[in-house]
């Protein structure tokens, strides 16, 4: 069997370090905040080439806190790509703003710049730049647009830990960056966790206050906030994993390149393309196939686990039925029925990728 995700195998490979750190946290009985969280925040900020990091409860909270901290005009429009996990759009609505969907590029699945331009109105205040599947957006173009229209750039980095755009790691290229440490991520906790990155000190302070009940100091609160804190056990686990991330990423890239070499000339299959200016970290390796569901079942019978990310484009979700707009012609809304995620991760070798590709060719 080739597993889609194998967190147990990953744990076994770092068991001694993980167990030691968890026991250390328990022994010291400092579970919320404290040195473990501070150490991880510093290490992760340095790793991502950012000045400030605020650990939070999860990736969705990171997005909501970031949007709130930016103090955008009330009920303003925020542009979100039509292919992503629901959090990218959900956070916008939960913060009282209006979701405006834009289309994606078919080759790399990131924001389509020309369609984005057509969605901007006087009510637009920000762009959620989703570095989907681990491939950074065209950030240079987004920055030009943001400056022209006075927009904020919120980087959704939930799937792009360590990804680079023109040599710079994502997360602090825009105004603010949001990360998820959901267990299945490239850098995953053993539970929920998230982080916010920025180079703006005042913005980082505000995010930290929002995440901790608007607190100035203990029992002194400047405004209403929320409870969204990265706990010490998760921070300790993430600190161990962060040291391994580059090795795991190299393994993902090797598997992805193997898939591409083996499948790129196959009729009916579309493999993802990578912009030369980016480092793609391949959180997911997503192909397009006109008989996706049949191929998925065929691979299941051959003991190959696969996934679908995502089976329904965001504008087509029942949750967003209230949003007006003609999205039928969106690439995102046409290809969602074709998307298939192949196994990738630290547990997938080049030989595993060749085996999967061989079975796909024999379909």
Q: Where are each of the predicted segments found?
A:
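Active-site phosphate-binding strand-loop segment of PLP-dependent enzymes
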Residues: 107-189, 195-197, 202, 341
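Conserved coil-to-alpha-helix start sites within the AMP-binding
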Residues: 84-89
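Phosphate-binding glycine-rich loop
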Residues: 29-77, 91-95, 101-103, 168
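N-terminal "arm"/small-domain region of PLP-dependent enzymes with the aminotransferase-like
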Residues: 1-30, 35, 343
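Helix C-cap/helix->beta junction micro-motif
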Residues: 95, 148-149, 302
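Hydrophobic "anchor" residues on beta-strands that sit immediately upstream
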Residues: 2, 77, 151-152
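Short beta-strand->loop structural element characteristic of the AMP-binding/adenylate-forming
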Residues: 98-108, 307
């Amino acid at each position: 069997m080739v597993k889609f995700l194998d967190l147990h195998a990953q744990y076994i490979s770092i068991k001694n370090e993980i167990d030691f750190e968890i026991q250390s946290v328990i022994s010291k009985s400092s579970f919320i905040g404290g040195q473990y969280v501070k150490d991880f925040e510093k290490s992760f900020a340095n790793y991502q080439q950012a000045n400030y990091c605020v650990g939070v409860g999860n990736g969705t909270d990171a997005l909501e806190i970031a949007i709130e901290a930016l103090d955008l005009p009330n009920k303003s429009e925020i542009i979100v790509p039509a292919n992503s996990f629901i959090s990218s759009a959900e956070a916008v609505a939960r913060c009282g703003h209006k979701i405006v969907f834009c289309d994606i590029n078919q080759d790399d699945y990131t924001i389509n710049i020309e369609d984005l331009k057509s969605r901007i109105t006087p009510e637009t205040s920000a762009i959620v730049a989703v570095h989907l599947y681990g491939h950074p957006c065209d950030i240079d173009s987004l920055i030009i647009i943001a400056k022209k229209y006075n927009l904020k750039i919120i980087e959704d980095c939930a799937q792009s830990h360590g990804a680079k755009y023109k040599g710079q790691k994502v997360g602090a290229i825009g105004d603010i960056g949001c990360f998820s440490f959901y267990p299945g991520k490239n850098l995953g906790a053993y539970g929920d966790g998230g982080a916010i990155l920025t180079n703006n000190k005042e913005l980082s302070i505000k995010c930290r206050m929002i995440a901790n009940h608007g607190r100035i100091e203990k029992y002194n609160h400047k405004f209403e906030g929320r409870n969204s804190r990265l706990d010490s056990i998760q921070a300790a686990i993430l600190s161990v994993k962060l040291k391994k991330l580059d090795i795991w990423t190299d393994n993902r890239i090797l598997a992805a390149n193997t898939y591409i070499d083996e499948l790129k000339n196959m009729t009916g299959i579309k493999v993802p393309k990578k912009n030369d200016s980016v480092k793609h970290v391949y959180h997911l390796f997503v192909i397009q196939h006109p008989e996706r569901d049949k191929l998925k079942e065929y691979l299941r019978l051959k003991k190959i686990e696969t996934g679908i990310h995502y089976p329904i484009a965001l504008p087509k979700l029942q949750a967003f039925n209230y949003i007006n707009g003609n999205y039928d012609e969106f690439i995102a809304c046409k290809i969602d029925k074709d998307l298939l995620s192949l196994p990738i991760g630290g547990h997938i070798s080049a030989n595993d990728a060749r085996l999967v590709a061989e079975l796909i060719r024999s379909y």
